[in-house]
Amino acid sequence: MMSFLKGRLAGNKGYTIDQTILIVAIIAILITLIIITVGWQLITRSTGTKLAAQLRQIEDANGQFYSQQHMWPYQAQSGTATGSSNMAALANQLASGSWTNAVDTSQLSNLIPGFTSSAAGVTQPNGGAVTEVVNTVDSVGLGSGKFIVVQFADVSLGDAEEADKAIDGEDDNKTGRLVYQANACTGATAMPTISAAPSNGTVNVCYVANAVQ
């Protein structure tokens, strides 16, 4: 009888040791899951914001180049300008004979520090190629006119989404200054109609930067 009463009293006092251990373990697991989820969101948001800053850095570099040379990088080359050579011009990686006579070579410098550059072109920190061309942009809802459009290749979808929010205020991959899709988002003379974003993987991100006309 005494043992029965002791058991009842112990049961009325609260959880058993085994139950307490189980509850503590469950709480610990839930806290870990929350930390992992929130941490990943913060990391993605941070890298997306960094991507937006890198795109704006190139836009600013174009403006600085124009201020110094009174022409855009694509106009400063003696040969046919390409998306890669335009970026090489910003990084001062073109061969000396590749500039037009109108360029003041004493003013040339690397205007995009932080990017890996060579005569072949420029890559972003994650290794994807960076190019820029002049395109019309009416297909992305920005009206008429010609702009320098910067493209980053092989960007993670999450980074593209967060960069879109940072630049356009919302994640809409088809319109605005920042768009992205699985295929290239620049064309020979005009930006293409942007397709729906993939559900995962990497994308090409395009940023409508400086107005040239």
What are these regions (language model features)?
Residues 10, 78-85, 188, 196:
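Intrinsically disordered, low-complexity coil segments
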Residues 140-213:
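Short, surface-exposed interaction loops/tails
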Residues 33, 57, 71-74, 80, ...:
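Extracytoplasmic low-complexity repetitive segments enriched in small/polar residues
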Residues 71-161, 169-172:
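Extracellular/periplasmic head regions of type IV pilus-like filament subunits
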Residues 1-17:
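N-terminal leader/signal peptides at the extreme start of proteins
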Residues 18-20, 24-46, 66:
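C-terminal juxtamembrane segment of a hydrophobic transmembrane alpha-helix
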Residues 43-73:
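Membrane-proximal N-terminal amphipathic helix
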